[in-house]
Amino acid sequence: MAAHGKLRRERGLQAEYETQVKEMRWQLSEQLRCLELQGELRRELLQELAEFMRRRAEVELEYSRGLEKLAERFSSRGGRLGSSREHQSFRKEPSLLSPLHCWAVLLQHTRQQSRESAALSEVLAGPLAQRLSHIAEDVGRLVKKSRDLEQQLQDELLEVVSELQTAKKTYQAYHMESVNAEAKLREAERQEEKRAGRSVPTTTAGATEAGPLRKSSLKKGGRLVEKRQAKFMEHKLKCTKARNEYLLSLASVNAAVSNYYLHDVLDLMDCCDTGFHLALGQVLRSYTAAESRTQASQVQGLGSLEEAVEALDPPGDKAKVLEVHATVFCPPLRFDYHPHDGDEVAEICVEMELRDEILPRAQNIQSRLDRQTIETEEVNKTLKATLQALLEVVASDDGDVLDSFQTSPSTESLKSTSSDPGSRQAGRRRGQQQETETFYLTKLQEYLSGRSILAKLQAKHEKLQEALQRGDKEEQEVSWTQYTQRKFQKSRQPRPSSQYNQRLFGGDMEKFIQSSGQPVPLVVESCIRFINLNGLQHEGIFRVSGAQLRVSEIRDAFERGEDPLVEGCTAHDLDSVAGVLKLYFRSLEPPLFPPDLFGELLASSELEATAERVEHVSRLLWRLPAPVLVVLRYLFTFLNHLAQYSDENMMDPYNLAVCFGPTLLPVPAGQDPVALQGRVNQLVQTLIVQPDRVFPPLTSLPGPVYEKCMAPPSASCLGDAQLESLGADNEPELEAEMPAQEDDLEGVVEAVACFAYTGRTAQELSFRRGDVLRLHERASSDWWRGEHNGMRGLIPHKYITLPAGTEKQVVGAGLQTAGESGSSPEGLLASELVHRPEPCTSPEAMGPSGHRRRCLVPASPEQHVEVDKAVAQNMDSVFKELLGKTSVRQGLGPASTTSPSPGPRSPKAPPSSRLGRNKGFSRGPGAPASPSASHPQGLDTTPKPH
């Protein structure tokens, strides 16, 4: 069992030894591989560096060429900056403008960068790349030789280890023999001891019988012991020698292994690295020097650019631009007045008839000028503060570029902008800058617009003040009586009430036009004319609401067929008149723009090109009926004219579109009005700005066209208007007797038209001034049944002159009434004026476009009746007395009746008729209110000729 344990122990030691040797062999092989790997890594590194240098050289060369092309492109004549002669003049002398000087310095710096990049490319592709190639060759050669040397040392080390194993085996063999010899010796000695122990009793018992035999056996045992002793000593000596050799080999191997691992391997690694780091450092130093030279040149160029930036001078540049382009920025010659066809008047005339219009306008302009001055000053203050804030934001943006670079040395040179708080702050600053810039541009637009308005208002105000001063001097030469006469001559009676078969407000406009024969409904024409005469300069027209009661009164009057805006309305009713006009269009059923066109019209507002949008809208509008299109053309031409006075009325096309968008183009049910109203307003604004291009011309669509210059409806010189103003006390009696006497006329009477008249319905006749009309019977106090040119219809009483015989009867009755009323000058004048023909201004002389124009038409000699001389002599006193009564009624006191002043506060005769109660044109006591009464049954309703 002991032998087996010993054998097992020996096998374990042998396996451990073999494992140790195996591990050492693996380490040595890995050392060779590691050395080769390090050499390969160095060669690859050097190859990568060489490739990098070559590629970097290519990049620098390409960059140099790109910079050169870039500089040449912007330096050549084909660049954007050199596309015009003006730019070429600036390019020849870039010092004229500081930005151009900066531009020239930047181009020069770019050229210098191109040259430096080309030089750097040559250095990188030439010496540095070649030097790296040489270093790679040296490293490869050294690594190969070092590996060979290391392989040799490893072989020697393994040979020593192999010798150690041999010595160990020799030692173990000799030691085994020594152990065996010792065992045999010990066995021989034990046998000898046994024989020696048995020999003593044997000797005492029978020495004589076995003496010789015992002696020979003892001798053999002694010789065996001696022999084995000698063998043991021999093997022991051999074992000792083998052990000594083994121990020496073991020490030698351990020393060799230690020397190899602690010295030889390190020396071999140093051999592989010989000159590598030094050579590589030299190459990188050369690269750094080349980059430093390029950077120094770039810093020098940037310094020059910084100096040019510091020399930026906005005021100086502006002065230089104005100096170079003096012919362009020099104010043009003033526009001169060019009189037409011998007109010698070259200044604003303030006649007595126009003073009531010009004086309020001058006062409105003065108040508007004061408000606009304050507003412009406030906007200017805000503009300066906003500009300062904007410049501060722009200036603070300069340092944000450096925030993108890291300050700590690392392999990455740029921060991650996704999570950088500085980038978020820069984004917020950018948004703040854009917001401030937008606000600044808005305020700049307001300031420039306000300053332009100030200049125009100031010029208008100065001209009007000069005209008013001249007018004050001229009015001193005109008597108050002449002014009052001319003032009365302007007044006129409203047209007789027309009866409509179609509803006006809330009805179908197309059917109303066809039924009434009015190309433009009277409410539209009259309201627009009233605003044209009184409200083009009215501030906030169509935006300020009128009095609801007044709006209702005007609407009801139009519903009755009357024109309440001829008399009874003043400039104070402008907002109410504008409200009536909007109310009319808003109440139409169906609306002017049918709902099926709403989507297509709204789609046109999305078109960015103005010409394309206008063409699209124009094509859509052709689908509307012609009468509706005529009214729309009339309305939007008026709105375009109204927007031209936005300096005074503050109603530009956008503001007017906001007012008329919901009125003309309501959003259909089921759609979001909030989301669509902006596009609706944009469409209406396009119609207001481009009416001439959107709507068809007169040649394509005949009908009335809005005229910018209108005059009040012309009136009779001495008609019922003066009778109502001067003889108000005698009027009830006269009106009571006139219908009774006129109804007594029997038979057909021929009357002469003293004014032209255009029928508004199919039942009303149209005629011209001077036409002979046949009157059959009196239909009402305002209308006659008669015929003209073979057509029968209704003829207005106030537009004709009765025959001489019939007139005498009326005059006689009037004189009798005047005698009953007394012999006062007022009554005499009233009775004289009420019965004579009215040879005066036509109430509505129609122009070629169908609009009423003011024209004075003298009566024919045979129709003219001269005023009685006594009446003429008493007219001045009558007017003064009547004006005195008017002054007392208005609270002016008796002082104003004695010496009427022709100044700006000229008193006006009080209007004798109110809305719906026009005495001269009102229905008689028995006049029917229904259409059947005004237009009796059985009348020939043949349409009027066109």
Swiss-Prot record:
Residues annotated as domain Rho-GAP: 507-695
PROSITE patterns: F_BAR, RHOGAP, SH3
Annotated site residue numbers, Arginine finger: 543
InterPro entries in UniProt: AH/BAR_dom_sf, F_BAR, FCH_dom, Rho_GTPase_activation_prot, RhoGAP_dom, SH3-like_dom_sf, SH3_domain, SLIT-ROBO_RhoGAP
GO cellular component term of the entry, any: nucleoplasm
Tissue occurrence: Predominantly in hematopoietic cells (spleen, thymus and leukocytes); low levels in placenta, lung and various fetal tissues.
Subcellular location: Cytoplasm
Predominant location: cytoplasm
Biased composition (Basic and acidic residues): 187-196
GO biological process, one term: nervous system development
GO molecular function: GTPase activator activity; identical protein binding
Residues where Phosphoserine is found: 860, 901, 906
Record keyword Transmembrane present: no
Ranges annotated as biased composition (Pro residues): 901-910
Coiled coil (UniProt feature): 128-195
Region ranges (Disordered): 187-220, 402-435, 885-946
UniProtKB keywords: Coiled coil, Cytoplasm, GTPase activation, Phosphoprotein, SH3 domain
Assembly: Interacts with NCKAP1L.
Role summary: Inhibitory effect on stress fiber organization. May down-regulate Rho-like GTPase in hematopoietic cells.
Name of the protein in question: Rho GTPase-activating protein 4
Organism expressing this protein natively: Homo sapiens (Human)
Gene field: ARHGAP4
